[in-house]
Design a protein with these regions (language model features):
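Alpha/beta enzyme core
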Residues: 1-66, 83-90
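Catalytic alpha/beta core domains of metabolic enzymes, predominantly
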Residues: 44-47, 54-118
């Protein structure tokens, strides 16, 4: 991929139920082996804004590449968790149009655009 000018992102599925120390180890290893960015996936939508902020804040202490977040909306908190992740140190996020995604959906792109404006 990198030989063709592409970037590599390691997305850790179900990361929200994984210990932060283990995630740091996995991410640092991936970066040492060429990953340009990493992504914490709240695959089952269990984070709260507080826990989202804290996880990204702790990751940012040891990770020097862009960190993205990927949230699911199982408890209706995907957008709130995304904003909390950005405040905690994420530099980008995954989203879908109208929040359409598996189960209860994902972070809604348009809600993030409007929320960011105000």
């Amino acid at each position: 991929c990198k030989d063709h000018g592409l970037t590599v992102e390691l997305s850790a599925e179900d990361a929200s139920r994984t210990s932060i120390d283990f995630l740091k180890t996995v991410y640092v290893n991936a970066i040492e082996h060429g990953a340009d960015r990493v992504c914490l996936c709240d695959t089952v939508g269990i984070l709260t804004p507080e826990s989202s902020f804290e996880m990204f804040k702790q990751l940012k202490e040891d990770i020097d590449v862009p960190i993205s977040c990927h949230c699911h909306n199982d408890f209706g908190l995907a957008v709130a968790n995304t904003f909390a992740a950005l405040k905690g140190g994420a530099s980008e996020f995954h989203s879908t149009i109208n929040g359409i995604g598996e189960r209860a959906g994902n972070t809604s792109f348009e809600e993030c655009v409007v929320g960011n404006r105000y």
